[in-house]
């Protein structure tokens, strides 16, 4: 095999140098405060966790980092009904009759949102769906057909007893879903949303007795779904009993594949003898 010309080696070294600079830029963006991700990065994930685990706190941060859409399926369903879309009208008929909205309607609502919501171009955070293995399978089928498979299924885990103390002090901004806590994460001004200045509310079902029933239902539903995503290899747990900043750092570690990228880069450079 003929040796490479000096000019070819120099060109290759320059390419490698540019690659290393690009990797360093990406690492810098992902480190520290977890600023906005590079334009080539996207996120496609499910954010799981019992009520009060912190989904309403972390989802907006993920959305901001990736410029993605946050699809809280309960809010999305209510919006479709209010807008009287075809899917919304169909769902309203079912709910008015006391029935449960079918998996097909929910998956189609998500599909419609992904196709028409410009915020979803850089990815999505699904919150509140799927709740069953059947729903997970149908969601995966739809996403596979649109060539947008899930990358992460992150579960925020926390002790039920701690949740009770958390939720009984929870405050919510109805329009955005942003959540606060009277003690652990208070708004800057009492009972006022930090972003809009609009009033916060305390949900009527945020009481200990109701919460215990909701938690029992959540655990019964979620265990099989967690097992499903464990098998696919995309499930990751996070200790949600930590303060919100630490939970965010744990999320960044999941999103950050810089160690793998850097490792592969270094290995390649060593193999071709261009890294001293």
From Swiss-Prot:
Region named NMP: 72-101
Predominant localisation class: cytoplasm
UniProt subcellular location: Cytoplasm, Cytosol; Mitochondrion intermembrane space
E.C. designation(s): 2.7.4.3
Catalytic activity field: AMP + ATP = 2 ADP
Single biological process term from Gene Ontology: ADP biosynthetic process
GO annotations of cellular component type: cytosol; mitochondrial intermembrane space
GO molecular function: adenylate kinase activity; ATP binding
Alphabetized Pfam families for the sequence: ADK, ADK_lid
Record-listed AMP binding positions: 73, 78, 99-101, 128-131, 135, 203, 214
Superkingdom of the organism of origin: Eukaryota
Transmembrane segment boundaries: none
Residues at which ATP binds: 52-57, 170, 179-180, 242
CDD domains: ADK
Keywords from the named record: ATP-binding, Cytoplasm, Kinase, Mitochondrion, Nucleotide-binding, Transferase
Region (LID) location: 169-206
Statement: the UniProt record of this protein carries the keyword Endoplasmic reticulum: no
Record keyword Translocase present: no
Role description: Catalyzes the reversible transfer of the terminal phosphate group between ATP and AMP. Plays an important role in cellular energy homeostasis and in adenine nucleotide metabolism. Adenylate kinase activity is critical for regulation of the phosphate utilization and the AMP de novo biosynthesis pathways.
Subunit structure: Monomer.
Entry's free-text remark on domains: Consists of three domains, a large central CORE domain and two small peripheral domains, NMPbind and LID, which undergo movements during catalysis. The LID domain closes over the site of phosphoryl transfer upon ATP binding. Assembling and dissambling the active center during each catalytic cycle provides an effective means to prevent ATP hydrolysis.
Family: Belongs to the adenylate kinase family. AK2 subfamily.
UniProt name for this protein: Adenylate kinase
Organism: Pyrenophora tritici-repentis (strain Pt-1C-BFP)
Primary gene name: adk1
């Amino acid at each position: 095999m003929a040796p490479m010309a000096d000019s070819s080696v120099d060109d290759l070294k320059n390419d490698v140098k540019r690659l290393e600079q690009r990797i360093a830029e990406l690492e810098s963006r992902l480190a520290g405060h977890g600023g906005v991700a590079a334009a080539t990065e996207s996120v496609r994930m499910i954010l799981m966790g019992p009520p009060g685990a912190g989904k309403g706190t972390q989802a907006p941060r993920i959305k901001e980092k990736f410029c993605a859409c946050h699809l809280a399926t309960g809010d999305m369903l209510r919006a479709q009904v209010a807008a009287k879309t075809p899917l919304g009208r169909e769902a309203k008929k079912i709910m008015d009759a006391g029935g449960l909205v079918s998996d097909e309607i929910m998956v189609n609502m998500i599909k419609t949102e992904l196709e028409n919501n410009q915020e979803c171009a850089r990815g999505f955070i699904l919150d509140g769906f799927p709740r069953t293995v059947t729903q997970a399978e149908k969601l995966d089928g739809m996403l596979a057909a649109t060539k947008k498979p899930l990358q992460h299924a992150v579960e925020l885990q926390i002790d039920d007893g701690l949740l009770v103390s958390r939720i009984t002090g929870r405050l919510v901004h109805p329009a955005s879903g942003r959540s606060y806590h009277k003690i652990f994460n208070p708004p800057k001004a009492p009972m006022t949303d930090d972003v809009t200045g609009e009033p916060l509310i305390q949900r009527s079902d945020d009481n200990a007795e109701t919460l215990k029933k909701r938690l029992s239902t959540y655990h019964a539903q979620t265990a099989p779904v967690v097992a499903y995503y464990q098998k696919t290899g995309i499930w990751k747990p996070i200790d949600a009993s930590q303060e919100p900043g630490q939970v965010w750092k744990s999320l960044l570690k999941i999103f950050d594949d810089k160690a793998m990228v850097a490792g592969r880069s270094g290995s390649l450079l060593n193999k071709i003898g261009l890294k001293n």
